[in-house]
């Protein structure tokens, strides 16, 4: 069964500011079919320590911050920032 995917305005705004090559890689993950079928994407999604439902996906020097609700089968893309900033602003 496919998971529901949501995107925050902040995520979309931050994604539009990324370098072109990084943005293309983020778009492949965020808008691709793989995340709908398996949000844990065979090891690419890593749990944030100290948080039950928050995860990160590493893309070079950038990180995507996501919230996964297993009960509702919902994946919410919340932030995409450089690795030095993501842990200050997410979750």
Residue ranges and their predicted role:
Residues 32-57:
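A short, surface-exposed loop/turn module that caps and links secondary-structure elements
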Residues 2, 16, 59-62, 67-91:
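Enriched for short, Lys/Arg-rich terminal
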Residues 8-10, 51, 78-83:
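Generic beta-structure capping elements
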């Amino acid at each position: 069964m496919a998971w529901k995917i949501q995107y925050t305005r902040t995520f979309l705004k931050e994604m539009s500011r990324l370098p072109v090559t990084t943005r293309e890689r983020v778009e492949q993950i965020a808008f691709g079919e793989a995340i709908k079928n398996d949000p844990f994407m065979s090891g690419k999604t890593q749990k944030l320590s100290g948080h039950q439902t928050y995860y990160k996906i590493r893309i070079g020097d950038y990180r995507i911050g996501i919230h996964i609700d297993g009960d509702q089968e919902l994946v919410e893309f919340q932030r995409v920032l450089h690795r030095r900033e993501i842990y200050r602003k997410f979750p």
